[in-house]
Every structure is written in C-alpha cells, then in structure tokens.
Amino acid sequence: MKEQREFDLVVLGSGGAGCSAALAGTALGLSTCLIEKALLLGGGTADSLGTIWIPNNRLAKEAGLADDHDTALRYARFVAGGQEVPENLEAYVREAPRVLDALLALGVKLRLALGLPDYFAPAGPGSCADGRRMVEPELIAR
C-alpha cells in the first residue's frame, strides 16, 4: 500500500498564485503540500518571464510611476475582451496590491520589472508603460 499523508492545505500548480497560496498557508501554520505536474516549477508565471501583473501597487508609486484603480480596471477589461466575470476582475484589481504587500511582509523579494510594459501598451485602453509587473530576481537567477 502506498504511503498516505494528510495536509491542511493542498495547492495544485506552482505558478505565482500557487506559490503565493502555499507560502500564505505555511505562514499561517498550516501543513502545506504544493503539487506541480511539470518537471520545473513556475507554471504560467514562468511563461511570462517570471512576472506577476499587479496594478496600482506601492512599489510603482514609490518609484514615481503613475497608476490608479480605474485605469488598471479599464486595461484588464480590454485584455479580457468581454470574457471576464466582472466581480472577479474588480476583485483582482482591488486586491492584488494588498497581496503584494502581504508577500513583501513575508519576505518575498518581489521587485518592479522595469522596462516591461503591459502586453498591449501603448495601444490598449488603460495600458501602462511600466510599473505593473513584478519579478522575484532570485528565482529567475536559479
């Protein structure tokens, strides 16, 4: 018989969201298991140069880059092309900056990925030339 184990939290996928969920669970004292089907970690985040899209964030503001909730939401709606669930998109744009702050507080060394504009900049409504993409340099270096 195969070994059986129990966990408080099981996370499927090791992209930015999965790793963030596993880190948060561990920080809360939960026994956590992160499962990835691929040979390497990173999921969809690895496909986007290891970046996470976090609009209207404090690191960009500290760097003097302008952004706001409504502009970011306009761009997110453009990218979704009418396929979004409006409440989910609104929640992402509203909560992503808070998630960034929580990850930074846990010691994740996310930095602005300067020089990487939104995918549809400058033509996309609400797009930003800089400041919305985060990267964890130590993970990329490995």
Tell me what each language-model feature is.
Residues E3-F7:
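Core beta-strand elements of the Rossmann-like FAD/NAD(P) dinucleotide-binding domain
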Residues L9-L34:
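N-terminal Rossmann-like FAD-binding beta1-loop-alpha1 element of flavoenzymes
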Residues S14, K37, N56-N57:
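Active-site-proximal beta-strand/loop segments in catalytic clefts of secreted hydrolases
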Residues T26-S48:
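Glycine-rich FAD pyrophosphate-binding loop
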Residues L49-I54, A129-D130:
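Short, hinge-like loop/turn segments at secondary-structure boundaries
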Residues G50, L65, L103:
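Switch/coupling segment of Walker-type NTPase motor domains
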Residues I54-A91:
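Glycine-rich active-site loop/strand segments that organize a redox cofactor
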Residues V93-R142:
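Conserved redox-cofactor binding core of oxidoreductases
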